[in-house]
Amino acid sequence: MSNPMVRSEKKHSFLLVVTTLMYVIFGLLTSVIGVVIDRFQTEYNVSLAVAALLPLAFFLAYGLTSIPFGMLMDRRGAKLVLLTGTGLMAAGALLCYFSDNYVAVIVSVFLIGIGVTAVQIAGNPFIRVLDAPSRYTANLTMVIGIGALGYALSPLIVPVLQSNGCSWKTIYLLIAIVCIAILLIVTFAQFPEAKAGEEERLDLSRLWTLFRHPIVCTYGLGIFLYVGAEVGVSSYIITFMNEVHHLDNAQSFWGEASFLYRVFPSKTALIVALFWLLQAVGRMVASFLMRFVSERRIFIFHSACTVIALLCAIAGNETVSLVAFALTGYFTCVSFTSVFSAVINSFDRDHGMISGLLGTAIVGGALVGWLVGSVGNRWGMVAGMAVNVPAFLYVFALSVWGKGRLDVNDN
């Protein structure tokens, strides 16, 4: 049976650019939560427990809507799902900007989370349609790599806006404007046919069959643990450095009168930004290297180095920890895309549903992150940060022994 997701190997460069821009926006919307959570807590005078509902609401959206969006994509195609996701991101961002109470902000973040889920669930397999299938892993790595710039930009944009007298919510207004522009572009864009045929449309029995498939199970667990560890590391770098190395948040690399001090007033804030920036750079470098080196070899090397860098960050002195945390971000650059594309390349159909199943596993970002914080509260942040090590070790094991196909030319 022919796969409707790969009928044409024609390259759709314009749609690839638009999809990449969507990924930049959802990167901003994902990482900005960690930047504004303390501002949210202060402005609305809520407890840390209430403030923690922001990331929980965001990742809960993945768990609740990934599979429905995957089914919708297989039935109606990528365009409808991408339009829905972009519209929800715009609506949620506008609601957040105009909200005057904390409940509305939490609801807006949940709506944004649903929109981001839709874009990622449809976008990840859709990228395979936009170029030759043999370039899928490299293209997905490149698009997510450029999109990861959004993760690095939010720690920059919010302080700059506030230094110019704007509210921290202004970033949501700017994002909403961009989303509306993308919505108009996508509405009138011509999409390649990517709908499943009538005989390929999924039912619950097919969903159950996919859910039990060994590759979906093992790699789905890999997504769960990887995203959880990524969140568990990046969200607790500042807490770890404060507790373990007594690094005050006010300590900076620059003088107080400089512009860089206003943007990155602390060393730890800079390292968090570098974690995401180096991850983005690493994805673009890896995308280029995949033209010449086996995707699996690149995956093995980077996943092994991720574990080594994190161990150095946990065990090293202040300087070693700062550098190693930034390098951990760099070496995680291919893990998500390699795990995801290995599953997609292993099946000739049902890519929307598979994307939905894998997207559901992203809820690990909330659960593993919570576990890191809980262990850190009870036994200290060295133990808390160490929770991420076995998660990254599992990803390394997948890179070596996993049965998924990283290259469509693999036997």
Locate predicted features.
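Helix-breaking motifs and short loop linkers at transmembrane-helix boundaries and internal kinks
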Residues: 45, 77, 98-103, 315-317, ...
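Extracytoplasmic gate region of multi-pass secondary transporters
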Residues: 33-34, 213-273
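Helix-loop-helix hairpin linking two adjacent transmembrane segments in secondary transporters
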Residues: 134, 139-191
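Cytoplasmic helix-loop-helix junction between adjacent transmembrane helices
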Residues: 108-145
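Extracytoplasmic
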Residues: 14-46, 124, 233-241
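Residue-level signature of mid-helix packing/kink "hotspots" within the transmembrane helices
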Residues: 31, 59-67, 152, 276-284, ...
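Conserved MFS/SLC helix-loop-helix module at the cytosolic interface between two early adjacent transmembrane helices
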Residues: 64-103
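Intracellular juxtamembrane helix-capping segments at the cytosolic ends
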Residues: 118-131, 333-348
